[in-house]
UniProtKB/Swiss-Prot annotation:
GO terms for molecular function: diaminopimelate epimerase activity. The record marks 268 as: Important for dimerization. The lineage of its organism: Bacteria, Pseudomonadati, Pseudomonadota, Gammaproteobacteria, Pasteurellales. This is Diaminopimelate epimerase. The gene is dapF. Homodimer.
Amino acid sequence: MQFSKMHGLGNDFMVIDGVTQNVYLTEEVIRKLADRHRGVGFDQLLLVEPPYDPELDFHYRIFNADGSEVAQCGNGARCFARFVTLKGLTNKQDIHVSTAKGKMVLTLKDEEKVRVNMGEPIWEPAQVPFTANKFEKNYILRTDLQTVLCGVVSMGNPHCVLQVEDINLTPVNELGPLLENHERFPERANIGFMQVVNRNHIKLRVFERGAGETQACGSGACGAVAVGIMQGVLDNNVQVDLSGGSLQIEWEGVGHPLYMTGDATHIYDGFIKL
């Protein structure tokens, strides 16, 4: 099976063309491939499939390193767009794809940048999914470590966002799994720790569902900015600094799609026998 290794700000992916080759993956196979010592190693595996809808270009599937399938990965979406172009699967500048939970438009800006229409943030608790009687800008969550105030949103996957004073002093790897697996998130959640620098600039660490803390999380950056705008602490165009690099997030507010712009880097091509 042929594959490519790619990354978006250090969030690394194994990308597989399921259009021109037959691909059958089980959770066990994905976990073996994800092993950084005995396999290829990655945060997520991205699978390019033919479109289910003739008006679209591709279907986009994402698997975490633990083998679980998820509906969204923002950094992966940028790499997906770069991959299908590099492999000659399309020559379009605007690439229309479906995911498990909706549709996306991926736009190639230049040889480095890709702009992704992430769709509208979803706030209704039942659709996140999150257990709450109604939407609120802030929710209180209690854990064994501490009680936190957070915003909750779906960008095609569930995000819980906490505002912190200093991301370097925040116990991300202790608090992250407690919130990821909190009983009010029936499908678990990605946990964002957001430090507001000013109204157009934040620093962010993300503890990803099924992957732990990664160098960058595109949908996490989108979720954090959406929550910050909804809570009134951010403006509509925000630079998000993650340990792997920076993303630019734009959102005009409720009723509008959210846009993410950032790099997508090809590392190498490979072949592995399953």
